[in-house]
Amino acid sequence: MDDIDYIDDINEDSINHMLSTLANVRDPEFSATISLMQEVLKIINSRIIEIDKKYKKNNRNINSMNNASSRVSY
């Protein structure tokens, strides 16, 4: 795991913890807003993961095609 990934994970965990704490505030409107923010962040995060998986899959396919073409002898 890269240091950068580790830092991103810590920041994501910190933000999630902060939002969870703020969602327990007694003001129902504020709490609802924070809960909505949490859901939006979950959707964004899942979309980023989906895009990252597609990128890695496409990258592997391109690399395997490049490797196959380099093995062709004339």
UniProtKB/Swiss-Prot annotation:
Required for the association between the dense viroplasm and the viral membranes to form the mature virion (MV). Keywords: Phosphoprotein. Belongs to the chordopoxvirinae A30 family. Interacts with protein G7; the interaction stabilizes both proteins. The keyword Cell membrane does not apply. It comes from Fowlpox virus (strain NVSL). It comes from the Viruses. InterPro entries: Chordopox_A30L. This is Protein A30 homolog. Phosphorylated by viral F10 kinase.
